[in-house]
C-alpha cells in the first residue's frame, strides 16, 4: 500500500514541536474584531498549542509523515 500523503492545507496551518505537540494560529481573528474584548485580541496573537486529543487527530489524519 502506498504511503499516505501529507495534506497541503495542513502543512501551511500546523507545526509540530520537538516534543510532538501541535501548534496552530488562534481562530476568530479574520474580521469583526471591533466587538471583541482587548483580552481576546491580545490572546489571539501568535500561535497556540492544540489540546492533546486534537493534536493526535491532526497528526494521524493530516500529517502522517510529520513536516
UniProtKB/Swiss-Prot annotation:
It comes from the Bacteria. GO terms for biological process: translation. It holds the Pfam family Ribosomal_L35p. Keywords: Ribonucleoprotein, Ribosomal protein. InterPro entries: Ribosomal_bL35, Ribosomal_bL35-like, Ribosomal_bL35_CS, Ribosomal_bL35_sf. PROSITE patterns: RIBOSOMAL_L35. The keyword Translocase does not apply. GO terms for cellular component: cytosolic large ribosomal subunit. GO terms for molecular function: structural constituent of ribosome. Belongs to the bacterial ribosomal protein bL35 family. HAMAP family: Ribosomal_bL35. This is Large ribosomal subunit protein bL35. The lineage of its organism: Bacteria, Pseudomonadati, Pseudomonadota, Alphaproteobacteria, Hyphomicrobiales.
Amino acid at each position: 500500500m502506498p504511503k499516505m500523503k501529507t495534506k497541503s492545507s495542513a502543512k501551511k496551518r500546523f507545526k509540530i514541536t520537538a516534543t510532538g505537540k501541535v501548534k496552530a494560529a488562534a481562530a476568530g481573528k479574520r474580521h469583526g474584531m471591533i466587538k471583541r474584548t482587548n483580552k481576546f485580541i491580545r490572546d489571539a496573537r501568535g500561535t497556540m498549542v492544540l489540546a492533546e486529543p486534537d493534536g493526535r487527530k491532526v497528526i494521524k489524519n493530516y500529517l502522517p509523515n510529520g513536516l
